[in-house]
């Protein structure tokens, strides 16, 4: 998709009511399972059109945090405050389709929504082109690669015309080239469409170029800041040395 066509196609730019800067604020969030604290003292603010990445080790609470924001986990303390009239799309870390459901990419993309959601055909066409899945629309979902599946799920998120997209380890199944393509796409939709993105990762080197803000957690926040600043943080080096080395 050319730069010129990207500039012209802005069908799913959204405007939120009563938003100055933040589309999401998390204040003093804590979460426990079976009396074991998973998250504690989490404070996060996400501005319109920003990409905020949660960096941390496996088992450090990243997925639990995403589930709280997505409304899946309810048993937390603290506050999760959204802008008025916000629309949210969620892309989980693990997604699978039963082998008993042989459906095409196109069918999945167009039919796996609530009947209440009005789908805009111009938005659908634009999303398919932007994400680059036009060539696999007639393929069976079970036959596409893991990387293509992630692009399909991203397209599915975008068709809902969200203001905030939650991505849990979205590139874990991709090779380096597919990762670069995915990050280019989310950078495009964040800046040109003013869609905010909250995503998780355990790979610091690949998320630095596309992130506006990085928050390092291991059950609680150890350090946070803009990419250039976070790389200089001594705490990051001490706590997350294995991730810096990647």
Curated annotation (Swiss-Prot):
- Cellular component, GO, one term: plasma membrane
Q: Where does this polypeptide localize?
A: Cell membrane
Q: Give the bilayer topology.
A: Peripheral membrane protein
Which PROSITE patterns does this chain map to?
A: ABC_TRANSPORTER_2 (PS50893), ZNUC (PS51298)
Catalytic reactions of this protein:
Zn(2+)(out) + ATP(in) + H2O(in) = Zn(2+)(in) + ADP(in) + phosphate(in) + H(+)(in)
Instruction: Give the InterPro entries listed for this entry.
Output: AAA+_ATPase, ABC_transporter-like_ATP-bd, Metal_Ion_Import_ABC, P-loop_NTPase
Q: Where is the ABC transporter domain?
A: 24-244
Decide whether keyword Nucleotide-binding is in the record: yes
One GO MF term on file is:
ATP hydrolysis activity
Q: What does this protein do?
A: Part of the ABC transporter complex ZnuABC involved in zinc import. Responsible for energy coupling to the transport system.
Put simply, this protein is called: Zinc import ATP-binding protein ZnuC
Organism expressing this protein natively: Wolbachia sp. subsp. Brugia malayi (strain TRS)
